[in-house]
């Protein structure tokens, strides 16, 4: 994953002044009950959106789960059926120079929901999602592997170029304890 140098500098600066404690340890077992609420950060690429629409089932969300979705205004057109879930969007005015979300109202809106898990479905590095995950206190944070994401996410998935996205997404569902 290619990570811009200005974002690396920003994250270094943020780590210096952030008094964030270590994430709580989690244990994944067959006897676990899974999560009840999940926030998915939706990708901006049209190709990924086709698979994501099926995976997240935005037209008919997973019953018994509180599902939240977040995406940019530009990407919202790729996800037309989002009436049944909490949808959070941001635009270019909500981003800082470092492409991170600066809108305090949006961050507070998401924090109030207190999601059990947050999942970054971007297969490429996304500064907005990485820093949003840094600021949220969900016990389970899942995303694709990168040098920076290893420090932010609880679980990272290594993306192989020849593997199908669907296999990664089914792995994410099993980690969440979601039964289809």
Protein language model annotation of sequence segments:
Residues 1-6, 150-180:
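Active-site-proximal region of nucleotide-activated glycan assembly enzymes
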Residues 65-74:
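Short internal beta-strands
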Residues 18-24, 89-109:
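Glycine-rich, highly charged phosphate/nucleotide-binding loops
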Residues 2-37, 46-47:
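Short N-terminal or domain-adjacent regulatory/targeting segments
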Residues 37, 41-45, 72-73, 117-119, 121-123:
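Structural motif
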Residues 122-136:
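An aromatic- and histidine-rich active-site surface loop
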Residues 38-41, 45-65:
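Histidine-anchored nucleotide/phosphate-binding helix
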